[in-house]
């Protein structure tokens, strides 16, 4: 004879969920668990139970843990007991929970104790309550402000008007020192500044004419300013200190003017009248005779020819001016114009000077 299972009554069936092969059917009932959670939330006292939740947590986040009863039953055999409750990302709605009789609910104090034993602190996957302006972010921003990426530059160094003023001042001082733009470019390598080498003449020219880009002007200004200071200091000490460390161009000292005595000078003039353009052998023989250097004799003959040419040009200009501005002779006319051999308006010039008298 087969034993038939008793048919559950209507009251008992309404309180049960479909059979899920669990020995703890009353605990797996989502309606009972939701009702108990609602009552515990309504009756809880924050002052008496301060360690229950994080004060920054929202009320519906306290019941978002899906398996805080995992120590009571096997999770592989049981279903989720909070299928009827909203998740932490959705607002809590008390109307979802279906009310039951007071005989089926748990004691609020027992529910609170069970929650404290199951989870004393929020799990790591709980809602992140980090403040957007936390101390960590403030500290990191302070570190960034303390160590800037690029060193600050003064407004005076980047002002276009200041750059223009310095470029004009640099050009005037360079000309006064007698240094060319190419000499400045070569002298920059002697400044011993890191990353600074010689520059071309065109770069210095473009700096003085303000045709470089603004960034290149700003970068080149302190370099040229440093050279200008050292060049002026070297110019002041040039008479006392021979070595100027390549800041100024190494120019040779000016040669002394060669003076020829009067007797030798008279003999040279006689040789010049005889032959204004002597050959190299003739210059060498004259130098040996007068005990002078060959180069000195050659330069004297060259200078003498230039002097003769200047004198000839000045005489030619003087005679040309005298011919144009000379006296004008008016024609002598008789009473009868027909017997006059000169036509009216004809003029004669007497004593017209020649070009070479």
UniProtKB/Swiss-Prot annotation:
GO terms for molecular function: DNA-binding transcription activator activity, RNA polymerase II-specific; DNA-binding transcription factor activity, RNA polymerase II-specific; RNA polymerase II cis-regulatory region sequence-specific DNA binding; RNA polymerase II transcription regulatory region sequence-specific DNA binding; RNA polymerase II-specific DNA-binding transcription factor binding; sequence-specific DNA binding. Residues 253-312 bind DNA. A motif (POU-IV box) lies at residues 35-44. GO terms for biological process: mechanosensory behavior; neuron development; neuron fate specification; positive regulation of transcription by RNA polymerase II; regulation of transcription by RNA polymerase II; response to mechanical stimulus; sensory perception of smell. Keywords: DNA-binding, Homeobox, Neurogenesis, Nucleus, Olfaction, Sensory transduction, Transcription, Transcription regulation. GO terms for cellular component: nucleus; RNA polymerase II transcription regulator complex. This is Transcription factor unc-86. The gene is unc-86.
